[in-house]
A protein has these predicted regions:
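Compositional signal for N-terminal targeting/processing segments
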Residues: 1-383
Length: 383
């Protein structure tokens, strides 16, 4: 093992980025799945580095986000156009969520500048695949899909202006009522289908998916579970069930050779069942679902957890601590990338690395690379 680590554990410089030798084996991978700890400063330079490398060296053009499709439309609009008003709106919608960090602003401004230098067929597109966390972001995102604004009824515009004032941290009966009426009047199926096809034009199918997402998020079983996340695994399980269906939907619409990068909370990314130390339950994670049965991406998923160390403290990555061992000790003082899935890897052999209680198989059943990120701090909230 020591010989392997000396060969494949590589210090990384965020400015210089990754190279093929450092990243290592990438054969047959189409879905690169990084696992972060939310609100940490070091996840942002890591995300830039990973995205740029995967775009330039592995042909990844799609950034999948741990956000709703509506919120994703706002970000994608910004990174294609540089519309600062939309970026500010999107950031305001992130407040109170797992993406509430001022470093989000720098990330998306960097990606806009990077994207503006790419030819049209090589530009990166951002797509939200999670549930619709923020109603306001969803509504605003839908307006970006409208191709024929002259078809929008005045009554809808009035309801929209009321509904867009909904707050996450307070209840406004009039705003909620306006939202319900608006969705009822514009739901793009049944008797409304013809009209809404005229409104959304070529974007109709995307609009239908977002409306369906809103229905999913409002279902009582799911809606109530989000208030009991310490004891009820339903919230996480349903979110990942939803995400896998969105990915399936994308695979049916994007080019057959499309490749993806996603940076999610680490809990979602592992490819094999494992216990969780924070709420001590198991569930069918997104990383596991991607490799299930006949799913089109089975065997093509590369999970890359970030082992994050705060200044002066031990790792905050609760789940990665299930795997953390003395063999990493020599590599925690600087950002380090380790490819675990090379041909001669001891991490793919049983009995070489002892897994913690509740884990079975070998380390590369769970993930294939790791990125060690020392000297992290809690990121300031969005201003």
């Amino acid at each position: 093992m020591e010989r392997y680590l000396k060969k494949y554990a590589k210090p990384v410089d965020f400015e210089q980025g990754l190279d093929d030798k450092t990243f290592g084996n990438a054969d047959n991978y189409r879905f690169f799945f990084a696992g972060e700890i939310h609100w940490q400063t070091m996840i942002y330079p890591a995300k830039k580095m990973m995205l740029q490398y995967l775009h330039e060296n592995q042909g990844v053009n799609y950034l999948l986000m741990e956000e709703g499709m509506g919120a994703g439309l706002l970000i994608d609009h910004y990174i294609q156009t540089g519309d600062e008003e939309i970026l500010n709106f999107a950031l305001e919608c992130k407040k109170g969520l797992h993406t509430d960090a001022e470093l989000e602003r720098d990330l998306w401004q960097w990606l806009y500048e990077y994207n503006s230098q790419q030819p049209e067929d090589k530009k990166i597109h951002a797509i939200g695949i999670d549930i619709e966390f923020n109603t306001v972001a969803t509504l605003k995102g839908l307006t970006l899909l409208i191709q024929n604004p002259e078809q929008v009824e005045d009554e809808w515009k009035t309801l929209y202006q009321k509904a867009i004032t909904i707050k996450r941290d307070s209840y406004d009966e009039q705003a909620v009522k306006a939202f319900s009426e608006l969705i009822h009047l514009t739901f793009p199926e049944g008797q409304n289908e013809k009209k809404m096809r005229e409104v959304f034009g070529d974007n109709y199918d995307i609009a239908v998916q977002i409306y369906d997402n809103m229905v999913f998020a409002s279902a009582p079983e799911f809606y109530n579970s989000q208030f009991h996340t310490d004891t009820d695994i339903t919230f996480y399980d349903k979110r990942d069930e939803h995400a896998i269906e969105v990915i399936r939907w994308l695979l049916n619409r994007l080019p057959e050779d499309a490749k993806f990068f996603a940076q999610y909370g680490a809990a979602h990314t592992y490819q094999k069942e494992m216990p969780l130390t924070n709420y001590n339950q198991k569930y069918n994670r997104l990383g596991m679902r991607l490799n299930e049965g006949r799913f089109p991406l089975k065997g093509q998923v590369c999970t890359i957890p970030y082992f994050i160390f705060q200044k002066g403290e031990e790792s905050r990555e609760v789940e990665s601590n299930l795997f953390y061992s003395d063999w990493l000790q020599d590599y925690v003082d600087e950002p380090t990338f380790i490819s675990l899935d090379e041909e001669d890897s001891p991490f793919s052999k049983e009995g070489v690395v002892a897994l913690k209680e509740g884990c079975e198989g070998v380390l590369t059943d769970y993930f294939q690379k790791i990125l060690i990120l020392p000297n992290s701090e809690e990121a300031p909230k969005i201003q």
